[in-house]
């Protein structure tokens, strides 16, 4: 062990400052990078939503699986300090690689704005993510445990508060990064073409990771450093394997039972190691139900964000984007951690209630379950406002009259009259085999035109009409609300030439006469656009402004030449109404989930450290983090296998599962007895001094020093 430094500040070791700043910078780096991944996969690498989501969750799961490797390296080979430094270098390289992979101009040899060697970008991205997963996962179990190592005996209160400060640093880094990196992403940059600036958005987190490494190394002279005690995980595995094999060899009634199944390893392994493994397995047993909490918690970045895309973000004069709602959790954490630590827990203690670690974790699981009940209620309210889209054997159609006369349209069992430059109020729904014929006529004009078109099942269509025998059927291409709360806009031109429209950096090319462009998607707010055409009178403007777009809407803009003066005019028609349920209704579910996180996650970190033997602290921290990985895997399984017709039903399922797990955990915790590993090991040290090292120790089973139920 390194020399213990006497320098301190407010009762805390000064070295803690470097560890907390390191964690803040590292979490900024990780969450800033992670916030961009799905959009990077979809918009830069060109993957579809399903593949992007699968790779994203696989990466997150890998980040929480690699802590096992980090714990093995720290406890068996390099020690915590050298492990953190070594894997932080790997981490920084990974961040730099993914930043380079996002440079469009790296392979854009023809300067068309698209990379010519996409497989190279994919390969670099995967290498970068693999290095990041190894780096961030490898240091996870080491940093918090290394911070706990800096405290002396008798500083239990300061150590417990350190874990709260440590968790506060995590969420402060997360909060700032999720605000800043999306702003960096929307900047335009590039040598040959202006693109979303992923290199800058990834580059800043890479720079912060380098800062984290430098800050951590600067504190080197102040740290208490414990030397690794051999391949502890290997010893544990061998001891457990020997105990199981020895027990089955002696399963006959002729052999007396032993107090604990691990006592069957006493023929080969010393009592100290067996006792330490008993401590570890008791804690690991409590970890079994925990992944269910993380299965719910990590859906903030997926299901809850998708829920926000079906809501409106206008709160007074403030406008919130759907992916910004994730910052609510980080903001609440920064506020609530000190309040809970300095106010709530002391008040509970003054009331005489023994609010132990496992009781706190049980309450946290219950609160997370209730958060999903609230999410289900919000989803029910959202579902009431969502438009109905056609099923697989249905067709939806509306009529848009872009002519100068009223038009009558005859559907099977339904007739509508549409005034000039107007549309039907809603989409009409028909079974595919029901829509056999559509007839169109114009009042005052002889004859009826029959629309000959084969409608595609499961899609919306628009019937454009502008006179007798003049029509066109357009497949809309929108069978759901626009993603991420954006707004879809398409143009229909009645001009007699091919035109181009430029709107907020996007181009609608070659829009032909009396046809519809594809939808392009824009965030909320008013958008400027320019119509390039020769069919415009002198002194007339070709520059226009859209209406003030809300969230999740879609519109058709019809362009025509005004008969009175030859100037262009544009009329807006609503295809999908904007969202009406406000994102503010998500705040209660975020509040409940954050309350659950504060009393569950912070407590879990401290519990894992306090109950671990000195040589197995990183192992138990890795076990704690492994529960997060398994939780992400549960989400993947349920998402793939569930296929719920209603999203609220999936929320209720998750809430019910966690509630059941919460009850099971409470029962398990009731039978757990708290121990002080340091005092137990001190007893072993004292006994070995009396009897001599290597002699048989009288402790045949672990007797707890202090006992507290749950």
Swiss-Prot record:
Glycans are attached at residues 415, 439, 510, 532, 539. Its main location: membrane. Residues 75-82, 140-161, 220-276, 349-361, 608-621, 669-710 are cytoplasmic. Belongs to the major facilitator superfamily. Proton-dependent oligopeptide transporter (POT/PTR) (TC 2.A.17) family. The chain crosses the membrane at residues 1-21, 54-74, 83-103, 119-139, 162-182, 199-219, 277-297, 328-348, 362-382, 587-607, 622-642, 648-668. Residues 22-53, 104-118, 183-198, 298-327, 383-586, 643-647 are extracellular. InterPro entries: MFS_trans_sf, Oligopep_transport, POT_fam, PTR2_symporter_CS. Residues 687-710 are annotated as: Disordered. This is Solute carrier family 15 member 1. The extracellular domain (ECD) region specifically binds trypsin. Residues 698-710 have a biased composition (Polar residues).
């Amino acid at each position: 062990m390194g020399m213990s430094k006497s320098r301190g500040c407010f009762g805390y070791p000064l070295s803690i400052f470097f560890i907390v700043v390191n964690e803040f910078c590292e979490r900024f780096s990780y969450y800033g990078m992670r916030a961009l991944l799905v959009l990077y996969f979809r918009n830069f690498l060109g993957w579809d939503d399903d593949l992007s989501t699968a790779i994203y969750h696989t990466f997150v799961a890998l980040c929480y699986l690699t802590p096992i490797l980090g714990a093995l390296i720290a406890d068996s080979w390099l020690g915590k300090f050298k492990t953190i430094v070594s894997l932080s270098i790997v981490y920084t390289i990974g961040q730099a690689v993914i930043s380079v992979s996002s440079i469009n101009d790296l392979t854009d040899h023809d300067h068309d704005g698209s990379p010519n060697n996409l497989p190279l970008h994919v390969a670099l991205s995967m290498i970068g993510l693999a290095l990041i997963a190894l780096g961030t996962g490898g240091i996870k179990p080491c940093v918090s445990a290394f911070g706990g190592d800096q405290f002396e005996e008798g500083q239990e209160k300061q150590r417990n508060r350190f874990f709260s400060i440590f968790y506060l640093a995590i969420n402060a880094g997360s909060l700032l990064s999720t605000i800043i990196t999306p702003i960096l992403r929307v900047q335009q940059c590039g040598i040959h073409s202006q693109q979303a600036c992923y290199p800058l958005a990834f580059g800043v987190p890479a720079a912060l990771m380098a800062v984290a490494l430098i800050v951590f190394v600067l504190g080197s002279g102040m740290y208490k450093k414990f030397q690794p005690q051999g391949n502890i995980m290997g010893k544990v595995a061998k001891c457990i394997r020997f105990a199981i094999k020895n027990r089955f060899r002696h399963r006959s009634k002729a052999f007396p039972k032993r107090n604990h199944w691990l006592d069957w390893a006493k023929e080969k392994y010393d009592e100290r190691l067996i006792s330490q493994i008993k401590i570890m397995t008791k804690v690991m047993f409590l970890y079994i139900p925990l992944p269910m909490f993380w299965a719910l918690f990590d859906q903030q970045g997926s299901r809850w964000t998708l829920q926000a895309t079906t809501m409106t973000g206008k709160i007074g004069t403030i406008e919130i984007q759907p992916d910004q709602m994730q910052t609510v959790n980080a903001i609440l954490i920064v506020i609530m951690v000190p309040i809970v630590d300095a106010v709530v827990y002391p008040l509970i203690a003054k009331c005489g209630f023994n609010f132990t670690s496992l009781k706190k974790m049980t309450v946290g699981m219950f609160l997370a379950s209730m958060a999903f009940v609230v999410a289900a209620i919000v989803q029910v309210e959202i579902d009431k406002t969502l438009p109905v889209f056609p099923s697989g054997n249905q067709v939806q159609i509306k009529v848009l009259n872009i002519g100068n006369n009223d038009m009558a349209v005859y559907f099977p069992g339904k007739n509508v009259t549409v005034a000039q430059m107007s549309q039907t109020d809603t989409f009409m729904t028909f079974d595919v085999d029901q829509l056999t014929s559509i007839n169109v006529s114009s009042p005052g004009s002889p004859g009826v035109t029959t629309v000959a078109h084969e409608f595609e099942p499961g899609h919306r269509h628009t019937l454009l009409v502008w006179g007798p025998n003049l029509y066109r059927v357009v497949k809309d291409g929108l069978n759901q609300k626009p993603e991420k709360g954006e707004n879809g806009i398409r143009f229909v031109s009645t001009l007699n030439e091919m035109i181009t429209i430029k709107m907020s950096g996007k181009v609608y090319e070659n829009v032909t006469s009396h046809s519809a462009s594809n939808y392009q998607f824009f965030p909320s707010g008013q958008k400027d656009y320019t119509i390039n055409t020769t069919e415009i009178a002198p002194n007339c403007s070709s520059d226009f402004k859209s209406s003030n777009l809300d969230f999740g809407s879609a519109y058709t803009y019809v362009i025509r030449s005004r008969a009175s003066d030859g100037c262009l005019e544009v009329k807006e028609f609503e295809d999908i109404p904007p969202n009406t349920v406000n994102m503010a209704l998500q705040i209660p579910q975020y509040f409940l989930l954050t309350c659950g996180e504060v009393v569950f996650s912070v407590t879990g970190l401290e519990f894992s450290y306090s109950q671990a033997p000195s040589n197995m602290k990183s192992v138990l921290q890795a076990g704690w983090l492994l529960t997060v990985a398994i939780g992400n895997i549960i989400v993947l399984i349920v998402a793939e296998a569930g296929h719920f017709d209603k999203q609220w039903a999936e929320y209720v399922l998750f809430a019910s599962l966690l509630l059941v797990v919460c009850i099971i955990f409470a029962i398990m915790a009731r039978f757990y007895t708290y121990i002080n590993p340091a005092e137990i090991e001190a007893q072993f040290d004292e006994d070995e001094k009396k009897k001599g090292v290597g002699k048989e120790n009288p402790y045949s089973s672990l007797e707890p020093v202090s006992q507290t139920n749950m």
